[in-house]
């Protein structure tokens, strides 16, 4: 025993305490109660009308305790000034969600959820169709069924937040979009909204920023008020905390997105003082904006400002100030890129890893998920894999005040997850199904898509060829077989040249590129890793028709948005993830028509797809066509 260090002894004691707390929910410690024959191909033709490092030490813990004690003293001296915030708990979604359920009711609901016992309901709304999924339970009620806010004053905001917001926007009015989202966001349900346009980015950000601030305010005030009561009567017992202080996690793609969020947060709080604001501005903004006006609007918006995707920031609230760059364990909100947070967590092979600061996240917000998809989706999955876990160390936790559902490892089922994206995608939808497990329910908004086939501005023959495959796992092989056996021979016979082969998946791109190399097929290629000098050479050779085929990846298009000259025809190896990319790609032959190297009626685009491609196909062909095209009896659909 004497060979053990003080830290090792403390850690052993902490682990023993956790076991004891979880082992018997009926016993009390001193101040707590543990609580998934190829058919003949048929053709359908349709004529279209034109139309900070997360480290802590004993000094940080002591500082946090002193600050908390100071805030409690302020509260005691202020008397009953917070009584104006008192709302009956049964009318406040915050209390209904986090305080009402017992661990037994939660355990029963979790079992139903894991067994797939989910009630589904589709409702028409102003944003299209919303699918609401809940675990049926007579006893468990984590949401207010009557919650339907029409104005900011209906959101059950803390009064000081409401006053600050109304000083900026006196009417308090919300748009139809905000009202529809707010009734689920502020009701603590999980939300996936994948139709955020460039015009409503700010509306969505304003809404989730309000929610994040409100949650932090309610958590902190609730804890401080109870601490004030305990200071006067130590016989009282409150279960009102998690293991660590951070309660809200915001995941964003770039430093500029973080800058916009923090500026909105500061504006809405009306904080008297913001510590480290100059440092924040220096590190998260840039002096000169250099983006061509010829680039699409969504591109200019996404890549505005500082586009660095490696950052993390702690934000701490006190009653009168906001501190930026606070240590994670002293922070209320953590704002980070998935890459930045993954680097802080460390790899699984690292001896020293730390992610305890994610143990008590109650609201997780992912904005611009489509941009994160084009970075590295695995980073996002990695972060959520390490969220709401039992902490390895105590970090100064007062276990007598830890909520029972934290001790029972049920917190991920009460965590609210909000995800916003410009479009839906397979990975985004999978995240919704596997990570958004809130027992209060989850809502996915499904917009009615008109499609983009007749919005190209000129005549081009658009052919969609369905590739037959027996299972999802066989899709890559089936697509490659169709491409190499059917389309490549046609390409080699075509003396016209100017064929752009667009490949969404980098792995498919590598496979096709290697096939071209093995078969000695002349081509050029541009992917996200191609050097600028090689890009210039490839574009010149392709335009001059010295190379008749160009391989082009989706991520290269996302980050560069090239408009190639010399394109006469397009083959899409699979449907683009973003329907806007389909529009941009199919418009490329227009330049060849203008340059006189392509007849006006000779432009063609061919898209390979499978029955499993409904998600990317729907915004391209429209909601009315997609089911028949993916599941109908015909394999070829042509739009002229």
From Swiss-Prot:
One of its GO terms (molecular function) is rRNA binding. One of its GO terms (cellular component) is small-subunit processome. Residues 24-72 are annotated as: Disordered. Its main location: nucleus. It is found in: Nucleus, Nucleolus. Residues 53-68 have a biased composition (Acidic residues). InterPro entries: P-loop_NTPase, UTP25, UTP25_C, UTP25_NTPase-like. It comes from the Eukaryota. Belongs to the UTP25 family. DEAD-box RNA helicase-like protein required for pre-18S rRNA processing, specifically at sites A0, A1, and A2. Component of the ribosomal small subunit (SSU) processome composed of at least 40 protein subunits and snoRNA U3. This is U3 small nucleolar RNA-associated protein 25. It comes from Schizosaccharomyces japonicus (strain yFS275 / FY16936) (Fission yeast). The gene is utp25.
């Amino acid at each position: 025993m004497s060979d053990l260090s003080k830290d090792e002894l403390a850690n052993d004691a902490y682990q023993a305490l956790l076991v004891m707390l979880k082992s018997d929910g009926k016993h009390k410690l001193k101040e707590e109660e543990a609580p998934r024959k190829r058919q003949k191909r048929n053709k359908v033709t349709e004529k279209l009308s034109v139309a900070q490092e997360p480290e802590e030490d004993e000094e940080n813990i002591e500082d946090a305790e002193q600050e908390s004690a100071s805030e409690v003293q302020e509260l005691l001296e202020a008397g009953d000034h917070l009584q104006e915030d008192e709302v009956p708990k049964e009318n406040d979604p915050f209390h209904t969600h986090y305080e009402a359920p017992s661990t037994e009711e939660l355990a029963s609901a979790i079992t139903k959820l894991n067994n797939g016992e989910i009630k589904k309901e589709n409702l028409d709304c102003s944003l299209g169709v919303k699918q609401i999924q809940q675990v049926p339970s007579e006893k468990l009620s984590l949401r207010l069924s009557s919650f339907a806010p029409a104005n900011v004053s209906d959101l059950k905001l803390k009064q000081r937040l409401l006053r600050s917001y109304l000083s900026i926007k006196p009417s308090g009015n919300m748009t139809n979009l905000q009202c529809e989202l707010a009734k689920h966001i502020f009701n603590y349900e999980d939300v996936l909204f994948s139709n955020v346009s460039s015009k409503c980015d700010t509306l969505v950000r304003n809404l989730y920023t309000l929610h994040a601030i409100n949650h932090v305010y309610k958590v902190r005030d609730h804890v401080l008020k109870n601490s004030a009561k305990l200071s006067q009567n130590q016989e009282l017992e409150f279960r009102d905390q998690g293991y660590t202080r951070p309660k809200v996690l915001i995941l964003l793609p770039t430093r500029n997105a973080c800058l916009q969020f923090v500026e909105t947060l500061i504006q809405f709080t009306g904080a008297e003082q913001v510590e480290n604001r100059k440092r924040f501005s220096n590190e998260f903004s840039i002096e000169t904006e250099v983006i061509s006006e010829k680039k699409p609007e969504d591109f200019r918006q996404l890549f505005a400002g500082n586009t660095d995707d490696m950052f993390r920031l702690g934000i701490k609230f006190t009653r009168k100030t906001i501190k930026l760059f606070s240590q994670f364990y002293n922070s209320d909100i953590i704002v980070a890129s998935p890459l930045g947070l993954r680097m802080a967590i460390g790899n699984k092979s690292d001896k020293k890893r730390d992610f305890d600061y994610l143990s008590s996240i109650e609201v997780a917000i992912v904005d611009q998920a489509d941009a994160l998809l084009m970075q590295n989706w695995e980073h996002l999955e990695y972060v959520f894999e390490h969220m709401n876990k039992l902490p390895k160390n105590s970090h100064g936790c007062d276990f007598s005040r830890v909520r029972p559902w934290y001790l029972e490892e049920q917190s991920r089922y009460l965590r609210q997850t909000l995800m916003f994206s410009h479009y839906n995608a397979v990975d985004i939808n999978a995240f919704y199904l596997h990570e958004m497990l809130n027992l209060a329910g989850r809502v996915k908004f499904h917009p009615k898509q008109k499609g983009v086939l007749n919005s190209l501005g000129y005549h081009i023959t658009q052919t969609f060829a369905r590739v037959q495959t027996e299972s999802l796992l066989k899709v890559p092989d089936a697509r490659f077989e169709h491409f190499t056996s059917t389309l490549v021979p046609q390409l080699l016979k075509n003396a016209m040249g100017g064929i752009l082969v667009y490949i969404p998946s980098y792995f498919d791109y590598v496979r096709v590129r290697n096939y071209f190399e093995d078969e000695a097929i002349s081509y050029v290629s541009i992917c996200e890793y191609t050097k600028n000098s090689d890009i210039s050479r490839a574009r010149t050779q392709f335009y001059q028709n010295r190379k008749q085929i160009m391989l082009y990846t989706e991520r290269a298009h996302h980050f560069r948005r090239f408009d190639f000259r010399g394109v006469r025809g397009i083959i899409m190896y699979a449907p683009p993830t973003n329907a806007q990319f389909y529009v941009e790609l199919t418009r490329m032959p227009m330049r060849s028509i203008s340059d006189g190297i392509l007849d006006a009626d000779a432009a063609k685009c061919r898209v390979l797809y499978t029955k499993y491609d409904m998600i990317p196909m729907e915004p391209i062909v429209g909601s009315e066509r997609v089911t028949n095209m993916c599941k109908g009896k015909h394999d070829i659909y042509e739009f002229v």
